[in-house]
Amino acid sequence: MAAAGREKGYVTQTAAALDKSPSLSPQLAAPIRGRPKKCLVYPHAPKSSRLSRSVLRWLQGLDLSFFPRNINRDFSNGFLIAEIFCIYYPWELELSSFENGTSLKVKLGNWAQLEKFLARKKFKLPKELIHGTIHCKAGVPEILIEEVYTLLTHREIKSIQDDFVNFTDYSYQMRLPLVSRSTVSKSIKDNIRLSELLSNPNMLTNELKAEFLILLHMLQRKLGRKLNPEWFDVKPTVGEVTLNHLPAQASGRRYNLKVKRGRVVPVLPNIGSGGSSHREIHVKQAGQHSYYSAMKPIRNMDKKP
């Protein structure tokens, strides 16, 4: 009897403990949730890209091994371009022969294989675009991707580039304030990459590039002085001041009157039928300080007896 009473007391204590514990009761009462449904997640568009929406949708639908976050960096080695061509031509190009690296040797090797494939398929990609993509020139990879899109889909797209790409940062520098623009040395360092010097160590070619950048910087400075004369304290010349103060219509009328007066030459009427002689007439033309003599036959006014 005593043992049975002890067992009943132990059962009642454990039941009371379970009722009092707040952490166990909600876990037992909560229903078991199923696995979350998988939703289709599209990769985000690359930051500050100048690709059109149709090209971005096309890249998202290709299911690439990784989506490009930085257009200039991710397309420079040619691995993603090779993967795109492998999707369209799986039996003619093997992705295993390409390497996803950042060294100059890897980039040149991948693009050399791509150039052979393009020549075999008679696809034409400008070498300037390939060169600019390898060396991460601003705005060049976007044009290359649009060319590849046109070759593979046979669709024409309207480029959204602001201006023509000249493989320099000239357009970017012109949009900056005058204080923030780079100097000549900084412009040369920014536009001639180290990879260009390593791939083409010809000193003459690099000197010509540097001279071109210096001339471009001088042109940029002259244009800045013309557009912002107050900043550079450029004083107008005497001719500019005169043209600014004179009205356009009045100055044009005065000039026409001067020209007309200078060109008028008096001619004597014919009198009688006597002998003729010659007389010098000095005429002053507008805009000239020299006189010239014109020989005019004039009949003699004296009558013969």
Swiss-Prot record:
A molecular function (GO) term: microtubule binding
Residue ranges of domain Calponin-homology (CH) in the record: 49-155
Residues that span the membrane, as ranges: none
Entry keyword set: Nucleus
InterPro entries: CH_2, CH_dom, CH_dom_sf, Spermatogenesis_Ciliary_MAP
GO biological process: regulation of cytoskeleton organization
Gene Ontology cellular component annotations, sorted alphabetically: axoneme; cytosol; nucleoplasm
Cellular localization per UniProt: Nucleus
Record flagged with keyword 4Fe-4S: no
UniProt xrefs under Pfam families: CH_2 (PF06294)
Major localization listed first in the record, in broad terms: nucleus
Function, as annotated: May play a role in apoptosis regulation.
Official protein name in the record: Spermatogenesis-associated protein 4
